[in-house]
Amino acid sequence: MLRLPKKGLPRFEQVQDEDTYLENLAIQRNASAFFEKYDRSEIQELLTTALVSWLSAKEDVRSQVDLPCGIMSQMNNVGFSTAILLTPVDPTALLDYREVHQMIRELAIGIYCLNQIPSISLEANYDQSSSCQLPPAYYDTRIGQILINIDYMLKALWHGIYMPKEKRARFSELWRAIMDIDPDGKPQTNKDIFSEFSSAGLTDITKDPDFNEIYDEDVNEDPTYDPNSPEETAVFMKYAENIMLKLTFSTTQIQQYENVFIFETGYWLTNAIKYNQDYLDICTYQRLQQRLYLQKKIIQKHFEKKKDIRRGIGYLKLICFLIPFLLSLKKKMKVPYLSSLLQPFSDDKVKTERELPPFIYGRDFKCQNFHYKENQYFHVHGGIEFDISTPSIENALEDFQKNLEKIRDCAANTFIEDSGYKEYYSIPVMEFHGKSYYVIYFELETFYQQLYKTQWWGAINEIVNNLRLKRLPLTDAQLHEQFKKKLGFKRAMKCKSIPFGMKSAVERGLSAVFHTFSRKTSSSTINVSDEAGYTIFHHAALHNRVSIICQLCNANFKVNQRRFVTFSQGPTPLHLAAQACSLETTVCLLCSKADYTLSEKRGWMPIHFAAFYDNVCIIIALCRKDPSLLEAEATAENQCTPLLLAATSGALDTIQYLFSIGANWRKTDIKGNNIIHLSVLTFHTEVLKYIIKLNIPELPVWKTLVEMLQCESYKRRMMAVMSLEVICLANDQYWRCILDAGTIPALINLLKSSKIKLQCKTVGLLSNISTHKSAVHALVEAGGIPSLINLLVCDEPEVHSRCAVILYDIAQCENKDVIAKYNGIPSLINLLNLNIENVLVNVMNCIRVLCIGNENNQRAVREHKGLPYLIRFLSSDSDVLKAVSSAAIAEVGRDNKEIQDAIAMEGAIPPLVALFKGKQISVQMKGAMAVESLASHNALIQKAFLEKSLTKYLLKLLKAFQIDVKEQGAVALWALAGQTLKQQKYMAEQIGYSFIINMLLSPSAKMQYVGGEAVIALSKDSRMHQNQICEGNGIAPLVRLLRISTIAEGTLLSVIRAVGSICIGVAHTSNPVSQQLVVDENAFPVLIQLLRNHPSPNIKVEVAFSLACIVLGNDVLQKDLHENEGFEYADVLYLLHSTEKDICLRAGYALTLFAFNNRFQQYLILESGIMTISIFERFLESTVETEKAMAAFQIVVLAKVIRDMDHITLSARGVTILVDSLYSVQTSTIVLTGNLIASLAHSRAGIPEAFTTLGTIQRLCYHLYSGIEEVRAACSSALGYLTYNANAFRILLKECRNKPNQFIRIKNNISRDASINPAFLKEFQMQQTLVGLPSLSLEKNGGPSIIPIFKRGKEHRRKLKPKIQPKDSLTLLPPVTNFMGLFKATKKTKDSHNIFSFSSTITSDITNVSRPRIVCLNQLGKHVQKANPEPAEG
């Protein structure tokens, strides 16, 4: 009933008009609707928080609190009616103006009416769901949605699990029924739990393309730490329930000019561990922190990948400023004019989730941060907070002040043109100083009750006051219901005990429950300490329960109350808040006049806790309160500043922030330790790397580390070495800094220490930098070699392994003899007695490198009995040891026939062959390397390998996919081909045309070379093979290689020779088929270009010779070469005057081929330049018989071209020299002479007669009895061609009649392509048939002597029968040389026998040295047998 006043009815002017009445009614209706979204428990939380908040405006002096620093205490002049905010733009995620206005509206209601600022905390429920604990004012708001979405994505990245918002909202309602959750929160279902979650939409977050491989990246730069080791995982999971990741936002800059505010905000990703020091000691904390740091790095790197997240972060940054800004306006009685804002979102658009369903891991989920049992689901925890303190307001920059009117116009005109509904409302943007800023505008009105009019805040306050009387305090039933909902039935029953219930309410953040309990009990009961000495106040600070702290402050509890056990120097609530990153609590306590200068037992103030526990936002709040705290020293222990404590704990974020605000990094603790010393002593290498990047001359990290290496303290030396070991691996250039700092001599001194762990770490560090030549030189100069060799005799295999690696690196830098001088080789060989694989690998690799190109070291390995060890490892059970020993044997025996024979004598060949019967291709590759080395220029070893059918195994390597395996197989095969043409031809036939052509097409220089050599071997004196190569399209690959400009010179030489060899046959006969095919492949232009332009004279002269082979005896091609290709003999003639004898002689040979049996070409040569006998004289007088014979051949053919001597005289001299050469004792001379005589025997008239006159026939017949097949073949060919001369015909027929076996020898040894007079064959057969041959016993007819000089019987022939039978007979010289190499005097050389040297460097494979990045001290003395070097039984 409406009661009228006694003065009667009101006057008309006092009555509200109808419009005002309707407006008030709408306001009251909206206010009532605002509260309809809450259920009873939420209303109770809302009312309690609004009632007790320290942000509520009270006039009671006793309840006054300090204002937060910054804008709330500085803003004075608020005479403006509009506010304009400028904040930087993120162009990749633009904000929406309507969203901004929505948030301003929600903040106005939350701050002005309900005294609540936004935040979120995800709290665990008893059934493993997670409550989205927002301040109740922000339920069902856009701000609440953004907070939940951002925090959920943070937790999703932390756990690697995600469920889309729509699906998780639906699943949140159903999952308990699906799982059949009992009152204790346990699932009773028999269903596959993960399948249910998966079908509901839960997935591995890496399925999202934006996060596809984020957990595959290794962000751990400390090799000493394995975050996924069982020990670290177990420790982490022990404390995981109370570890949380949270985002903290803080305003970093504010500028003001009149009503324009320019601000910037930042955020930090912080981890908080809600344990006090009784449950979590500092050492364990640092272990957890190290793992969390790696997890944070991944999240920070990928968190803002999605546009929605970047936009959400942008809104949260804006909210971070709006909170203190609106609080400041509230203090100045100003409020946003909500009616001027854009239309709000409907209620169904801003619904917030009250809880989140649990997470669960699938078997194949990639994230390894947490380890739960299979099918175990779990809750998530974390939060987002805003710092309501701000930096001091600065005056706006001049650019902003000058453009004030433009800013105001831009802000005011935003919605004038189009105020209708739009999907997206853009915020105007302006540029200042090259940076874009949003221009956000809203109107203000006065914040007080107006006459006759009800304001929106008045209506809400009225409802709050009415509800408070109805809803508070809670009944016992409501208390039980609240506890049961959050904690489960069993624990809810325990909460009937007030102390237990109050503590549970504090830990869970149940403000209304705590308010009710506090009404039921006395202050003394509330303030009682638990068994650890902590009060409710401490627990509230630790768990960041601001509303409960407000209740305690309102009840006049001591804000500086200490933990008390046996002494009163325990931490205050502010200490615990600083430790646990309770940002809101810290600001609340500071404003409640908590003493931030109090120290606990270690002398730490809250600022020290914040620095040590890496809580940047707490440091910001404390330093804004009192900037002097930045350099505050702890009052006990080492008197550390916050910066020094941060270095002690490795709090990198804190260190970076403290440096940015000017903390004094020169300060030291009481022991003189600065930030570098403390980082080293506590092994925080991330901090050291950061300081290195700062590059502050007064903070010399490298110099400091060297000083620590040189000090007396074992700990300081050890920690310095350990830090250097890690740092040198962090950056590819840090090794140089270590070197330049003079670290090497200090490290060498440490090697002389008696501390085995220090020695281990030192050699570990040295092995990480010894891969660089300059570091090796410094090591040698500092006397490191004898120190390292001395360590080889210690008892620790880890030291052996590392020292061997370093010596391996040193040996690669020309220090092989120095290592040998200090008895390095016997020391290394002694280690081969060990049975530890990584040691054996490194030792054998070191021995291998020491022997590369060093005959003395090769002999030393044999002399010190190292060969049996290496050979024994060929039969090891370990593939690695087999491969490494093979590689070592290859270098020990390379180019040293004496050692090769010794290795064979020790029994290396059978186990080497056995390697190829295994399946490991890498082992076979190294075995092939050993085969190549041992067989090179060693006929006996080649024979031994061939007798064991090694060829078929090596051929399998040619089928491998890897190019390096193919080329090693090819090189090994060619090493087995030996130096005789017969053996090479046999090997080429075994390889086959297909493989040879594939080699020529290969990109490998080695393969191309072997392919070229195989073509030479096959085509040499064999028209059949030449034609088959042509038919198999083998010429095109050869010509293609000629066109490659980058081809290796050795390979190019081989290919050029192959092209020539394929066109020339026995006794300088030609093959018109192959000649024409070579020309058809356009080889002429390529060869002419090489002849004229290639820088190497070797290439030029070989091209000239090949051109001569291509046109030999082919007038059409000779004409084509001269007329169409522009070939001139002058291009070859000038090579005759080369200072190199080989080139000069080879050029003469090329011209000889051009002139051979061709008078016209001789004329062209004569016209092209002057050729005198002096060119050949040095060869004709040479002591090298092959040079002399070749020059003699040339002057005979070129007799009419040489101008200064009669051609008859020249021919006679040449023939005489060749005949005399047949009396040589050198095989190569006889073979060459026989072939040259065969060629001259079918040249011009008179030459065969001259040979016959000089007794050539008899001498050639004598050589038919030689034991060397090449000699017999060459002489047989010469005799065959001489039979076309009548006189020679008669003499040879007589020889064959008197010695019946003579004809058989000629027939058996003559080359298939060589020619013999058919008339001679017919005549001999006729005389054999009709006349008969004399008895073999007639000595007077040339028969055998009674006392035989030579064994010529059947038995001898059987022994001479070669095991290698190529398809056609072999003659002449090794095709690799093509006569050229025979013209040098025989001399011993230390160089490789390979004419074309290829690098023998081992590719990256299983034979690499074992170089672990870090020495694990906890593994010293523990060695597991990894390999059995003894052959397996059976």
Curated annotation (Swiss-Prot):
Start-end of each ARM repeat: 732-771, 773-812, 814-852, 855-894, 897-936, 1072-1112
Matches recorded under Pfam families: Ank_2, Arm
SMART domains: ANK, ARM
Membrane topology term: Single-pass membrane protein
Keywords: ANK repeat, Membrane, Repeat, Transmembrane, Transmembrane helix
Keyword flag Metal-binding: no
Predominant location category: membrane
Name of the protein this chain belongs to: Ankyrin and armadillo repeat-containing protein
Organism the protein comes from: Homo sapiens
